[in-house]
């Protein structure tokens, strides 16, 4: 049985938001909320400054706290590793949002129910890759079967120095980062010390500016 996951290669991500736009288009995600978003970190002092990017979304955890706490089983672990949701069962109680350590869930303002990245399950079931993977111009998002030792994603996880977000939560996430850092992966690590600036493009204004 497959066990699907993602690798985000921070060495190549250029922060173009193609993944965010593709996800919104694929799933009709409303303004003001995102299933996937890009985090920016500015480091240094101009002109010796740098900008780093990192894509954040549902981690598709094997031990997902959102599925455990959901009172209606609207969120559930599939046998292929994808954490999916059924908005017809959701009652909008926001328990999943409180339980998720990755801030991956939101309430759809049009439906009043929880939503998040579901690995484009409808595409995967028809042998297509998730929309974000297809559109990334630098192939910074890699998807695939973690149980297949010959898959690209398995090779990257085995051979590269990968990190996961909030490993101390013991959620066993299926989302791995290459060239990650505490500042990129943990919002609590970005306490301002004058050397970097964190920016998340998740607001209504940012969405409108991007035309998404």
What are the language-model segments listed below?
Residues 201-206:
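Conserved small/polar residues in nucleotide/adenosyl-binding loops
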Residues 10, 18-39, 63-89, 95-112, ...:
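Iron-sulfur cluster-binding cysteine motifs and their immediate structural context
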Residues 112-121:
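Solvent-exposed, charged amphipathic helical/linker segments at domain boundaries
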Residues 45-61, 97-104, 122-134, 160-180:
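Short Fe-S-cluster ligation motifs
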Residues 3-9, 25, 33-58, 74, ...:
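Sequence context of c-type cytochrome heme-c attachment sites
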Residues 66-67, 175-197:
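Short flanking/linker segments adjacent to small metal-binding domains or redox-active Cys/His motifs
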Residues 84, 91, 192-194, 199-200:
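Flexible coil/turn and secondary-structure edge motifs
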